Amino acid sequence: MIRKKNNKVVLAYSGGLDTSAIIPWLKENYNFEVVAFVADIGQSKKDLNGIEKKSLESGASSCHVFDLKEEFIENYVYPVLKTGALYEGSYLLGTAMARPIIAKKQVELALNIGANSLCHGATGKGNDQVRFEMAYAALAPNLNVIAPWREWNLNSRESLLKYLDKKNISTTATLEKIYSKDENSWHISTEGGLLENPWNQSNEDCWSWTVNPEDAPEKPEYVSLQLKEGCVVSVNNQKLNPLKCVEELNSLGAKHGIGRIDIIENRLIGMKSRGCYETPGGTIIMTAIKAIEQLVLDRESFRWREKIGLEMSSIVYDGRWFSPIRKSLQAAADSLSLEITGEVILKLYKGSVTAVQKKSPNSLYSEEYATFGEDKVYKQSDADGFIRLFSLSSKIRAQNMLK
């Protein structure tokens, strides 16, 4: 089926089996000039080595590789950290945060070179198709969107390999069923394989960055983090930019088996999925941020921040990065984060990270008031009137029930 002629499409290209097949498929079925766009957000060097040559051999007219690692951490990861967002209580949103920056740069390239279409390799079962296309709609509503997985009949690994062989395009992929992995500077995820059965216990093939906590060092390691307005600015008294902070803490955390989660999550499209996620640096940073939060936020602010984090986790997960509500919640979180400044010393030991010391110039904690010993600043009798008023509605309700 030959579609429109003389058109140009920008493909979000990873170099994997799917997107390698998409290039010739687009040319065959749409008669398009295919421009490959590669976002370097910290995936393994193995995935990036020779990727330009590979895309051209697959039929792309050109390949554009963008180094987005620093921008990803500074403008996407750190802002979300300020909100305290954890999807369904544990997922630090590593894949979800990466999609908007990829889509944004893909759109910018398309507009710059005069392309009229965008294409992604996300499957029709996953969240990423929604995330990409939500971003496309917000940033370039007039560009066409092509989602091959919702059109073609190449719905198995075997059929994709046969298609590439037919097109004389070489690939290192095999028929062996392997895990699906997604990696960037913030995290790595592993899905598929034995994980598709929730009764199967994950094995070490499911983990890529972190050592098994059982095999981690027998002695704990301590790390000091300095935070300024909700952002980590130094590690062990060494000032580092956001990307370097994350990389340093990834290395430290991985050595101690920190940041592993094996979860079943609710996908946006309705089904449940299981994944093994590793976010060693992010787990350490989030623990430090929460430690300072406890010192500096009053009760109402703390509760408001928890609500922001809960809502933001769904917004980011669902691909609504460029929505007005995301920007509004970010502004609220940024305001609260102005107080989150201080130092935290964390203990790293066999898969756990614990904030063991914390201090802040904005601390609301007063040892004088909190002591269980004798004090001269708090009159315990003052609690009488407070309790009478605070319990008044409960008392009236109980009296009515006795009538």
Curated annotation (Swiss-Prot):
Sequence positions that bind L-citrulline: 91, 127, 131, 180, 189, 265, 277
Cellular component GO terms, alphabetical: cytoplasm
EC numbers, comma separated: 6.3.4.5
Binding residues annotated for L-aspartate, in chain numbering: 123, 127-128
Subcellular location: Cytoplasm
Lineage: Bacteria, Pseudomonadati, Pseudomonadota, Gammaproteobacteria, Enterobacterales
Cytoplasm among keywords: yes
Name of the protein this chain belongs to: Argininosuccinate synthase
Ranges that cross the membrane: none
Family according to the record: Belongs to the argininosuccinate synthase family. Type 1 subfamily.
Catalytic reactions of this protein: L-citrulline + L-aspartate + ATP = 2-(N(omega)-L-arginino)succinate + AMP + diphosphate + H(+)
Assembly, per entry: Homotetramer.
Source species: Buchnera aphidicola subsp. Acyrthosiphon pisum (strain APS)
PROSITE patterns given in the database record: ARGININOSUCCIN_SYN_1, ARGININOSUCCIN_SYN_2
Known pathway: Amino-acid biosynthesis; L-arginine biosynthesis; L-arginine from L-ornithine and carbamoyl phosphate: step 2/3
Residues that hold ATP according to the record: 12-20, 39, 121
